[in-house]
Amino acid sequence: MSHEIFEQAKPILKKIQNKGFKAYFVGGSVRDYIMQRPIHDVDITTSATPDEIESIFDKTIPVGKEHGTINVVFQNDNYEITTFRSEDEYIDHRRPSEVYFVRDLYQDVQRRDFTMNAIAMDLNYRLYDYFNGQQDINNRVIRTVGVPSERFSEDALRIIRGLRFQSQLNFQIDSDTLHAMSSQISDIQYLSVERVVVELKKLIMGNNVKQSFEVMQNMKAFNYIPFFKSFEMSHLHIDEPITFELWIAILIVQQPKDIQLSTLKISNQEKATIKKWVTLIQTLPKIQSKQSLITLVYDYNLNDIEILLSLHHLLKQNGLTTANHLIINEISIREANEKLPIHCRKELAINGKDILNHTNKNSGPWLKDTLREIEIAVISNQIVNTKEEILEWVDAHVKI
C-alpha cells in the first residue's frame, strides 16, 4: 500500500541508489505507516557518507554532518538523510564518544532505541525488520532493541521516550524494559532539561497519559528533572490529556513555590501562557453568575469548550477550588460563547485613536481603562457594537 509522503520522497532514494548506495526509510514514519497513523515527515538512512550525499544532491545543509546527518532540500521540502552508523561507548548517558560510519543496515538499526522504531523500508515498501518490531507493534508492546540496560545506558532520554510512546500509542511496556527503566531512572538527571521537556510535552497530551504519568510517579522520575523535583509530584493527578502549559499552571497553583519558570528552558510565549492559566485557575472560584462566565469566556478566548471543562475536572480532581458546576458546564459555556457579540478587542467598532479624536485628549492610562469599560459594556449587551452608539455611551458613562 503506497503512501503520499513516501511517494514524494522516492526520487531521493532512487537518486542515492543510482549512485550505487543503499537507502531506506526508517524510524517513526515506518512505524506509523505500519500502524496506519498520520505521517508528518520521513527519515532516510543510507550507506552513503555525508560527503557522498553532498556530491549527489545540488542543495544540502550540513545540519549534523559530524554525526552523519545531512539535510537535503528536494522539491521545496527538507529531508534528513543519515549515514548508517555504529557508535562507541556513550558518555554522560546522552551521547556517544565517537560515531563510525558503516555500510551495513543491520549495524545501523541495532543501535536504535525500540524494536518498533528499528524497522527499515525500501522504496518498494519492503520491510527490513531484524528485531521483530512488527510483532511488537501488533501486540502493542514497547521493547528495546537488545538488552534494555545497555540501550538506556547509551541515552537515558530513551526512558522518557518509552513512557511518551506508552502515552501516545497506548502500548504496554515490556516487563524487562520497564524494570531497566526503573533501575536506571536516576540517569535522566544528566540530560538537558530541554530534551526532557520536549518529551514531556508529548507525553502529557497522549491518550494514555494516566498510565504513563503514574509510572513516572512510581519510578520517582520527577525527582531527577529540574523544576519538577521541587514539587511533591505524587500529589498531582492527571487522568486525561492536557497541554504542558496547563499542567505546569495546575502544579504551581496546587503547590505554590518560589521556582522560576526559566528553569524549564521554555519560550517566553509558553511562560506567558502558563501565567495566563494560573490567573484563570485563580479566577474560576469567583465565577458566580452567567455574566461573570461570559466575561471569563471572552477574556480568555475560551471558545474551546473541552479545555475549560477539562480544567474544571482537573481542578476538582486535585483538590483545588473551582466554580460551581451549575455555573460551569458544557451547556453554560456554549451559551456564553454564543452570546458574545465580539470575541476580542480588535472586533470593537472603534479603537483608541477614535476615542482620542472624539475626546480631544492626550493618550494615557485612562485610554486603556476606557477601552476595557467599552468591552464589558458590549459583551454584557449594554450597548450595540457600533461606533456611534459606543461614543454616545462614552459621553454618558465614562469619566475622562
Swiss-Prot record:
Homodimer. This is CCA-adding enzyme. It comes from Staphylococcus epidermidis (strain ATCC 35984 / DSM 28319 / BCRC 17069 / CCUG 31568 / BM 3577 / RP62A). Mg(2+) binds at D41, D43. Belongs to the tRNA nucleotidyltransferase/poly(A) polymerase family. Bacterial CCA-adding enzyme type 3 subfamily. The gene is cca. GO terms for biological process: RNA repair; tRNA 3'-terminal CCA addition. CDD domains: NT_ClassII-CCAase (cd05398). The keyword Repeat does not apply.
